[in-house]
Amino acid sequence: MVLINGIKYACERCIRGHRVTTCNHTDQPLMMIKPKGRPSTTCDYCKQLRKNKNANPEGVCTCGRLEKKKLAQKAKEEARAKAKEKQRKQCTCGTDEVCKYHAQKRHLRKSPSSSQKKGRSISRSQPMFERVLSSTSLDSNMLSGHGALSDTSSILTSTFLDSEPGVGKISKDYHHVPSLASISSLQSSQSLDQNFSIPQSPPLSSMSFNFLTGNINETNQNHSNHQHSKSGNNWQDSSVSLPAKADSRLNMMDKNNSVGLDLLGHSKRISPISNSRVGEVSVPLEEYIPSDIDGVGRVTDKSSLVYDWPFDESIERNFSTTATAATGESKFDINDNCNRINSKSYSKTNSMNGNGMNNSNNNNINSNGNDKNNNNSSRQEHQGNGLFDMFTDSSSISTLSRANLLLQEKIGSQENSVKQENYSKNPQLRHQLTSRSRSFIHHPANEYLKNTFGNSHSNDIGKGVEVLSLTPSFMDIPEKERETERSPSSNYITDRPFTRKPRSSSIDVNHRYPPMAPTTVATSPGALNNAVASNLDDQLSLTSLNSQPSSIANMMMDPSNLAEQSSIHSVPQSINSPRMPKTGSRQDKNIHTKKEERNPLNNIHDLSQLENVPDEMNQMFSPPLKSMNRPDAIRENSSSSNFIIQGNSMISTPSGRNDLPDTSPMSSIQTASPPSQLLTDQGFADLDNFMSSL
């Protein structure tokens, strides 16, 4: 190992074999031995500072790196200085000889100027791309009234003139076209109705470029004779960019088009309608929006939108009879049915028409007269009309019908007096209302819908609500509407006179009020009204606890009770379970209820109508008679009611208004003692079991 200037050297074999310390070879080339570990990047000065506790040096020593950079910078500067000195010594600019260094620089500086001169000469003789006049110079020269243009040095910039032909580069000045604002300002001083066939911007109309051939065509069509004849200057003389022999191309304007714009000579006259701004392009709205949108009509039509609705005749008829009933358009079937109801001749054909109206229950809204059962074809034609498809959806029927009922109840309360007269004077109307209420109450939901919207098939039930669903609009309900204009769903509420009945305090949770006013026709026992059954059960609950079965049978067959219940359409078949009232004032309420319910029965004077339904009365009264086997229990000469027995049927006639029998079991028990004293422990136990079974 040889140590030279602090660096160790050894032969290559000894370095590979890790025998550096014992290497003494002299016949082989020596190599520098790398120091072990990482090389130290800290200078000696920084090492000394780290040993000193008082000093706080930086973590990384940059002294060596900075010195290297400084040394490299010095070397570069010295090399530049030497090169300059050498050029100075070899420069022969002062002598006749050509200098090697400075002559080359001068040639590089002079070459653009020579090409610039060539470009100018070529552009003047054969212009490759000629630029039109700028907007500022065009406005200033046209509005000043002088024919002489400003110098072309202000128009043709140096960037355009420096471009050599054939290089393939187009300067951005070529794309400069007079802006629309400059054109509008140019034309603002003149009338907008002036004909554009007289050219007002000669550079635009006198210059055209053919992109296929690359030729520039200049036409000075009557420019020197039209506007600039006063000053004696022509566009051709003042413009350097135009060639001298431009007259040979006067007829080229018809063959070529101008750059980016049509010729002003071909433009139309500006009318006052389209004089918003010169240069604007008007695009018709039908180009983007169809001329006839569904439900909107023609977009550009200035007429009212009322005439643009594409309604068919059937839709207009259905819509007018429901939504615009107050405007007088609903004249289709209303007058006919009003005359039918108010007429004094009650023939069989009229009654058949009335029953047909009640059974099919189209109620003069969907169509007039003969079209009641033939509306399906017109409804199917308009299934794709958007808004009407929503109303045919069965999910929206219940919500809209509920709102319709509320509106009809509010309106119907204002017509109490008129309906009382019609109800009392027209027995035919009472018969119609009776059959209608019976068809509504005693049929299931599907059968009611079937009877309400006509004898339709599977898909016609939802379609019948098409016009009905449009009714609950508070804007379209008239102040006074007739009875025949009512919707089918609210007939059972609004067609009867509004006689408010006292609220029942029955313990039955399923208690319902009787939906119809008292009439003379009783229903079959299979369609028993729940409200009537619960009412009668409450009345019989007192006697069922402390009386024999014979007394119950006597009370059921008592003519006074039958007369009282005949105004509520039905009598229950049998009493299976007793019921007890909750309050002590139950008996008084029952007495007042029976008095009020029996009052409307006195309005009926025609007993012959009751003979139309002997079978129904027979079906109603036959089970109690057979089950109890007590025909002698009927008191025919009772003070409260009379019975006419014809074969198997029995018809009750109303008695006096306030004649309550004093001998009936119900009245005797009600006046005897309060119900709290009638119950024993066994009675309370039975009542508890009965309530738990409910």
Swiss-Prot record:
<keyword id="KW-0804">Transcription</keyword>
<feature type="modified residue" description="Phosphoserine">
    <location>
        <position position="125"/>
    </location>
</feature>
<dbReference type="GO" id="GO:0071468">
    <property type="term" value="P:cellular response to acidic pH"/>
</dbReference>
<dbReference type="InterPro" id="IPR051763">
    <property type="entry name" value="Copper_Homeo_Regul"/>
</dbReference>
<keyword id="KW-0862">Zinc</keyword>
<dbReference type="InterPro" id="IPR036395">
    <property type="entry name" value="Cu_fist_DNA-bd_dom_sf"/>
</dbReference>
<feature type="binding site">
    <location>
        <position position="25"/>
    </location>
    <ligand>
        <name>Zn(2+)</name>
    </ligand>
</feature>
<feature type="compositionally biased region" description="Polar residues">
    <location>
        <begin position="111"/>
        <end position="126"/>
    </location>
</feature>
<comment type="function">
    <text>Regulates the transcription of a set of genes, many of which encode membrane proteins. Among the genes regulated are YGR138C and YRO2. Does not seem to be dependent on copper.</text>
</comment>
<feature type="region of interest" description="Disordered">
    <location>
        <begin position="479"/>
        <end position="514"/>
    </location>
</feature>
<dbReference type="GO" id="GO:0000981">
    <property type="term" value="F:DNA-binding transcription factor activity, RNA polymerase II-specific"/>
</dbReference>
<keyword id="KW-0238">DNA-binding</keyword>
<dbReference type="GO" id="GO:0005737">
    <property type="term" value="C:cytoplasm"/>
</dbReference>
<feature type="compositionally biased region" description="Polar residues">
    <location>
        <begin position="336"/>
        <end position="349"/>
    </location>
</feature>
<feature type="binding site">
    <location>
        <position position="14"/>
    </location>
    <ligand>
        <name>Zn(2+)</name>
    </ligand>
</feature>
<feature type="binding site">
    <location>
        <position position="11"/>
    </location>
    <ligand>
        <name>Zn(2+)</name>
    </ligand>
</feature>
<feature type="region of interest" description="Disordered">
    <location>
        <begin position="104"/>
        <end position="128"/>
    </location>
</feature>
<feature type="compositionally biased region" description="Polar residues">
    <location>
        <begin position="664"/>
        <end position="677"/>
    </location>
</feature>
<dbReference type="GO" id="GO:0006879">
    <property type="term" value="P:intracellular iron ion homeostasis"/>
</dbReference>
<keyword id="KW-0597">Phosphoprotein</keyword>
<feature type="compositionally biased region" description="Low complexity">
    <location>
        <begin position="350"/>
        <end position="378"/>
    </location>
</feature>
<dbReference type="GO" id="GO:0000978">
    <property type="term" value="F:RNA polymerase II cis-regulatory region sequence-specific DNA binding"/>
</dbReference>
<feature type="region of interest" description="Disordered">
    <location>
        <begin position="209"/>
        <end position="240"/>
    </location>
</feature>
<protein>
    <recommendedName>
        <fullName>Transcriptional activator HAA1</fullName>
    </recommendedName>
</protein>
<feature type="binding site">
    <location>
        <position position="23"/>
    </location>
    <ligand>
        <name>Zn(2+)</name>
    </ligand>
</feature>
<dbReference type="GO" id="GO:0005634">
    <property type="term" value="C:nucleus"/>
</dbReference>
<feature type="region of interest" description="Disordered">
    <location>
        <begin position="566"/>
        <end position="588"/>
    </location>
</feature>
<dbReference type="GO" id="GO:0005507">
    <property type="term" value="F:copper ion binding"/>
</dbReference>
<feature type="compositionally biased region" description="Polar residues">
    <location>
        <begin position="566"/>
        <end position="577"/>
    </location>
</feature>
<feature type="modified residue" description="Phosphoserine">
    <location>
        <position position="231"/>
    </location>
</feature>
<feature type="modified residue" description="Phosphoserine">
    <location>
        <position position="291"/>
    </location>
</feature>
<dbReference type="GO" id="GO:0045944">
    <property type="term" value="P:positive regulation of transcription by RNA polymerase II"/>
</dbReference>
<feature type="modified residue" description="Phosphoserine">
    <location>
        <position position="241"/>
    </location>
</feature>
<keyword id="KW-0479">Metal-binding</keyword>
<keyword id="KW-0805">Transcription regulation</keyword>
<feature type="region of interest" description="Disordered">
    <location>
        <begin position="650"/>
        <end position="677"/>
    </location>
</feature>
<dbReference type="Pfam" id="PF00649">
    <property type="entry name" value="Copper-fist"/>
</dbReference>
<feature type="region of interest" description="Disordered">
    <location>
        <begin position="332"/>
        <end position="388"/>
    </location>
</feature>
<dbReference type="InterPro" id="IPR001083">
    <property type="entry name" value="Cu_fist_DNA-bd_dom"/>
</dbReference>
<keyword id="KW-0010">Activator</keyword>
<feature type="DNA-binding region" description="Copper-fist">
    <location>
        <begin position="1"/>
        <end position="40"/>
    </location>
</feature>
<dbReference type="GO" id="GO:0033554">
    <property type="term" value="P:cellular response to stress"/>
</dbReference>
